[in-house]
């Protein structure tokens, strides 16, 4: 009985994670377009020493590029909510998820809702936290409507008319007058807290935690929590955590490849070829490139990569490195406010990982002999 309950909980949590990651996967192209074009807009504006007034320079090349960037970053949050709902309820959940996520991003709407319920503080919008809540609720409610038995002549209207309208009607008052304003207050507090964490002890701690999470399971649920957290903050204009996460995610494959090159006797012969591809994967921000090493020797590899990524993430936050793009690795380094420091943090973390892994791993032959004697 206990095992059945445990399996049910595990299955539910897996489903929640998959639904969330569906939303994130559809959101990433919007973040990428938004972040890159906004950065290009600032870069072009800087050529005429007009970087601070890019949005007031109507009709200039920088202004047009920045408008594309703003469009991408504005739509990314509703898209997140829309595709979480889509993952749960398929097509009937898509429009309600988008509309509910969009409406709670409008600060004036939430401020008016706050006036109605006597709670102030919704002017900033509910951010990606609100979109996640709206997406899950829209998906759950739409799926409930979808599972109802209805007369045959009504069935064709259910997915395109009745379910989307009913779901939106049911959840709009909930999101505006119950959940929206408190989530907006929490989102504003989080954004302000992170915006003030530039170079201080709290920033270093946050960078270290995010870095360690990126390396802890190399693409697993812990890694994804850190990644989603940082991607969501891009729409709020907070891009330092994204830099820390990207840098930290690049460290494990590069650091372990470096260790393999320095001390090949500590690894199986076939791992040497894996190291070559690991460098490319690492610089492409594919943390999973370190998994073959972790699978072969988790007790030594995981502490090594966690330490290196934590150091890299902490250094990035301490130095105030920013990254407006959610993916791309070495190919988006020019978009950083400090590209050389971005690369330096990658190298620092990789060296820490390489030194620790090389120091604590025994020679491969000795390790195999010890395992044979244990058997």
UniProtKB/Swiss-Prot annotation:
List all membrane-crossing ranges. 24-44, 68-88, 93-113, 122-142, 160-180, 203-223, 238-258, 279-299, 301-321, 340-360
Organism's domain of life?
Archaea
Molecular function, one GO term: protein-phosphocysteine-sugar phosphotransferase activity
Q: How does it sit in the membrane?
A: Multi-pass membrane protein
An example of a Gene Ontology cellular component annotation for this protein is: plasma membrane
Q: What does this protein do?
A: The phosphoenolpyruvate-dependent sugar phosphotransferase system (sugar PTS), a major carbohydrate active transport system, catalyzes the phosphorylation of incoming sugar substrates concomitantly with their translocation across the cell membrane. The enzyme II PtfABC PTS system is involved in fructose transport.
Q: Under which name does UniProt file this protein?
A: PTS system fructose-specific EIIC component
Q: Which InterPro entries match?
A: Bacterial_PTS_Sugar_Transport, PTS_EIIC, PTS_EIIC_2, PTS_IIC_fruc
Q: What happens when the gene is disrupted?
A: Cells lacking this gene are unable to grow on fructose. Growth on glucose is unaffected.
List, alphabetically, the PROSITE patterns matched.
PTS_EIIC_TYPE_2
Q: In its UniProt record, which GO terms are filed under biological process?
A: phosphoenolpyruvate-dependent sugar phosphotransferase system
